[in-house]
Amino acid sequence: MGVLKQWLPYVLSGISAGGQYALIAVGYTMVYGILRLINFAHGDIFMVAGLIMVYLSATMPLYAALPAVVILTVALGFAVERCAYKPLRQAPRMSVMISAIGVSYLLQNLAYYVTGGVPKQYPELPWISDTITILGASTKRVTVITPVLTLVLVVALVILIKRTKVGMAMRAASKDFETAQLMGIKINNVISFTFAVGSFLAAIGSMMSVSYTHLTLPTKLE
């Protein structure tokens, strides 16, 4: 029992971290599945979501800040796609990659400018950040919530992709981009929606991750 009490918090923390990275990975792979291009700015969107929460929580109640962070993060992902990717839809792949890297550096430097490169204290989220006891071992509730929430979101995403029209359009675009476009699928809307979903997952992952550390850094997720 003593060994379990000693090691259980580390096991739960590892599972929780795995859930956080899973949310980020799903966002990466969704974009890659359609564009066949890694969205280098995705980790920066994760970082920006944390900083948005820091500044919004200082100006409004947490119950209002939480949905606002998600909405603003989704809007950021949508804007990145519209500004950095859509104009280069017919451009060589290298041009799109350079644009993606440029957006990544832009968000990083903007974060450094706003924060001065100083880590910011993340607000403590009620209930989520509370300490609980499991089998005699103390851990934060977020370590238990994260893998469960990740599983729920992944199942919801599978249902979205398999059972809805937009999901069918996403699958068609990932199989054959040009043929899907010829069949009447609005590729631009599908891609923008994919970026929005990926950014939503990044926002949730950011909340879960930084709720555990209570510290957000003006640098991208590596």
Task: Please name every model-derived segment.
Residues 1-23, 52, 63-64, 91-96, ...:
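Membrane-interfacial amphipathic/re-entrant helices at transmembrane-helix boundaries
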Residues 6-55, 80-89, 95:
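Single transmembrane alpha-helix segments in multi-pass membrane proteins
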Residues 17, 138-212:
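Helix-loop-helix "hairpin" substructures at the membrane interface of multi-pass membrane proteins
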Residues 27, 67-75, 79, 106, ...:
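Generic alpha-helical transmembrane segments of integral inner-membrane proteins
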Residues 44, 48, 63-70, 97-98, ...:
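Hydrophobic alpha-helical transmembrane segments
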Residues 60-103, 110:
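Alpha-helical transmembrane segments within multi-pass membrane transporters and channels
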Residues 87-163, 190:
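Transmembrane helix-bundle core of multi-pass membrane transporters
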Residues 213-219:
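Conserved small/polar residues in nucleotide/adenosyl-binding loops
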